[in-house]
A protein has these predicted regions:
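Acidic/glycine-enriched connector segments
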Residues: 1-162
């Protein structure tokens, strides 16, 4: 299969950090789960997570749970730079490490920290996806930029508005 065909079966996630969403993690997971299930029904089998706190990690965990009963499902984790996620609170770092451990593929955009690595990671995810699932409040930042880039690339976005 060519890349254009493969991306029609890949879906990526983007969203604000937990403190910006104004909804509980439980509510977020329910809504993300519904959109992941819709994506699977629509033929998406590979999911791409940028592994940031909040939406990315919650979505990755949900994909891994579904993969237990559906071996077609794959998870790709795309990190902006090496050792990303290892400086958070113990709880988030533990979840991050566990997801990475079970991912089918881990891709690192940069060897070291840079602010531009975040946008390059987001563009890589969009460039390799046929759909974006976003938890978005309308605020400026990386999520808005990712949605704008996806629209510019004619990639459909499913927006979860908390």
């Amino acid at each position: 299969m060519h890349e254009q065909e493969l991306r029609q079966h890949r879906c990526c996630f983007t969203g604000h950090r937990p403190e910006k969403l104004n909804i509980s993690e439980e509510q977020l997971c329910v809504r993300l789960g519904l959109e992941i299930d819709r994506a699977i029904e629509d033929g998406f089998t590979t999911f791409i997570s940028g592994m940031a706190k909040g939406v990315d990690i919650c979505a990755a965990e949900l994909v891994l749970k579904r993969r237990v009963s559906d071996d077609r499902l794959k998870l790709i984790c795309v990190l902006p730079y090496e050792n990303f996620g290892l400086h958070w609170s113990a709880s988030w770092t533990s979840r991050y490490v566990e997801v990475i451990r079970h991912a089918d593929l881990v891709r690192c955009i940069s060897q070291e920290f840079s602010y531009s690595a975040y946008q390059r990671r987001n563009e890589w995810m969009v460039d390799h996806s046929g759909r974006v699932i976003a938890a978005y409040t309308g605020e400026s930042g990386g999520t808005r930029n990712t949605i704008a880039y996806a629209k510019q690339q004619h990639i459909p976005c499913v927006i979860i508005t908390p």
